[in-house]
C-alpha cells in the first residue's frame, strides 16, 4: 500500500469522515490546494451503472459556465476547404490523410480530436491508437461534426467531454484552485445537472453512489449530492 506523505497526512486530519455541503467542500479543497502551482480541482463520481451494457453507458459533453482554466490542444481531421477553416478557427493541428497517417504512427500531441463526417471511415482505422486514450471522435461528444469552427470555439472556451469508466466512475477536471468558490460551484452545479440529464436508460437502483472533490495534490472531500441537487439560486 502506498504511504501518504507527511503533507497529505496533515491535510487529511483536517477533514472529517462525513459528507460536506458543496460550498463547504469547495472551501476545504481550495484551502488545501497550497502547492507551488495552480492546482486543478477535480470531481470523482461513482455512479450506479455498469458500462459493459450499452444502455448503462454515460458519455456526453458539458459547457462549464466559467471554463476549466486549462488550455487544450485540438486536432482536426477534415478535407478540402474545411482544412483552412480549422486553421482559422484556432485548431492546433489540422489535416487530411496526412494527419491520419501521422496519428497512426503514434504522433498524439493533442488533447482532443475533431473530425468531419466524411473523414470518419479513415479515422475509424485509428481505433487501435485512439480508443485506449479516449480520443476517438464521437457524434454524442460533439467531436464528429460538420461545423468545425463552432466545435473548436466551444471546446476552447471550456466545453468538455466526460464519460463513465469501466467501473462506472466519472472523473472531471472542472476548474483551478485560483477560481473563486462561487465560480467552482457554478461549474460543479452545471456538471451535476448534465450527469442527471444524461442518466442512462438502463441505470438501476441508486444512481449517485459517491461524490468526492479533490485538488491535484490535496486529499479528497466527500460531497452531499442531495444538497447540490436541491440547490436553488436566490431569486
Swiss-Prot record:
Keyword annotations from UniProtKB, A to Z: Repressor, Ribonucleoprotein, Ribosomal protein, RNA-binding, rRNA-binding, Translation regulation, tRNA-binding
Cellular component, GO annotation: large ribosomal subunit
One Gene Ontology MF term: rRNA binding
Annotated coiled-coil segments of the chain: none
Keyword Plastid applies: no
InterPro entries (alphabetical): Ribosom_uL1_bac-type (IPR005878), Ribosomal_uL1 (IPR002143), Ribosomal_uL1-like (IPR023674), Ribosomal_uL1/biogenesis (IPR028364), Ribosomal_uL1_3-a/b-sand (IPR016095), Ribosomal_uL1_CS (IPR023673)
Subunit and partners: Part of the 50S ribosomal subunit.
The protein's name in its UniProt record: Large ribosomal subunit protein uL1
Lineage: Bacteria, Bacillati, Cyanobacteriota, Cyanophyceae, Synechococcales
Gene behind this protein: rplA
Amino acid at each position: 500500500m502506498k504511504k501518504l506523505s507527511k503533507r497529505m497526512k496533515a491535510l487529511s486530519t483536517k477533514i472529517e469522515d462525513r459528507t460536506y455541503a458543496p460550498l463547504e467542500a469547495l472551501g476545504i479543497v481550495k484551502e488545501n490546494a497550497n502547492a507551488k502551482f495552480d492546482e486543478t480541482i477535480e470531481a470523482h463520481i461513482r455512479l450506479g451503472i455498469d458500462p459493459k451494457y450499452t444502455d448503462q453507458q454515460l458519455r456526453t459533453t458539458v459547457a462549464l459556465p466559467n471554463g476549466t482554466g486549462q488550455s487544450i490542444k485540438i486536432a482536426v481531421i477534415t478535407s478540402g476547404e474545411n482544412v483552412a477553416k480549422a486553421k482559422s478557427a484556432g485548431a492546433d493541428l489540422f489535416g487530411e490523410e496526412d494527419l491520419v497517417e501521422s496519428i497512426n504512427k503514434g504522433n498524439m500531441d493533442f488533447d482532443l480530436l475533431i473530425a468531419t463526417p466524411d473523414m470518419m471511415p479513415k479515422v475509424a482505422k485509428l481505433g487501435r491508437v485512439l480508443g485506449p486514450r479516449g480520443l476517438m471522435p464521437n457524434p454524442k461528444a460533439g467531436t464528429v461534426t460538420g461545423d468545425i469552427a463552432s466545435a473548436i470555439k466551444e471546446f476552447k472556451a471550456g466545453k468538455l467531454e466526460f464519460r463513465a469508466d469501466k467501473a462506472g466512475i466519472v472523473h472531471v477536471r472542472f476548474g483551478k484552485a485560483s477560481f473563486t468558490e462561487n465560480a467552482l460551484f457554478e461549474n460543479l452545479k452545471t456538471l451535476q445537472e448534465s450527469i442527471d440529464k444524461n442518466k442512462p436508460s438502463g441505470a438501476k437502483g441508486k444512481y449517485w453512489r459517491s461524490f468526492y472533490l479533490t485538488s491535484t495534490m490535496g486529499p479528497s472531500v466527500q460531497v452531499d449530492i442531495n444538497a447540490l441537487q436541491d440547490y436553488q439560486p436566490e431569486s
